[in-house]
Amino acid sequence: IKKNTSRNMAIETGLNKLISNWGHIQTPYPGKYINHILKDIGENKLFSLIIDEKYGGNKISTTQLSNVLTKLSSHNPALGVMVMVPNSLGPGELLVKYGNESQKKQYLSKLSDGSLVPCFGLTGPNNGSDALGEIDTGVIFKNKNNELSIRVKINKRYITLAPVADLIGLAINVMDPDNLLPSDVKPGVTVALLERGHPN
């Protein structure tokens, strides 16, 4: 990792601290130290490597991110996965690319510092990590407040960080049989954000 900026130096320092503290743990996830490890990752801004500084992030280039993950994984592959997933797919990346300003302000700073741990619900028993495959479906309906909502029936498997996640990005194929969506909005594959404790 190049040490030509204070940001990169901070990342290097945080990375070395994480390796020193947890690199020797054989099963960091979902072992008994998981909450301590997640706190350490968040405090050292290692969840924020794809998030702009404007939202509390520590964004670096793809090459630099690859270097971070290579170094971490060479010490402990499980730790590498715990840092890789939030920095590569799921709520953080999707909010950065597609979220509106309100959503970015609500979630990105909390994802950056580890206040929210994300996961991405895509893989199911009949599909791998393929957003265009046989993924779960949702149906547009109007709730009791006459607001457009999505009723989803899900069956997910093998979701990294799911047992400890606070925010899930749920990939679903949305259908609109009653034509409730505005004419300029098309049904199809989308991602819903659900916080832990979301009512069924």
Question: Model-derived features: where do they sit?
Answer:
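A generic structural signal for well-ordered coil/turn residues at beta-strand boundaries
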Residues: 41, 116, 132-134, 146, ...
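General beta-strand structural signal in soluble alpha/beta enzymes
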Residues: 49-51, 119-122, 151-154, 194
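Short acidic, glycine/serine/threonine-rich loops at helix termini
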Residues: 60-63, 93-97, 129-135, 161-165, ...
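FAD-binding core of FAD-dependent oxidoreductases
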Residues: 76-93, 112-128, 155-168, 190
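Beta-sandwich/jelly-roll carbohydrate-recognition scaffolds of carbohydrate-active enzymes
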Residues: 106-110, 120-141, 157, 177-184
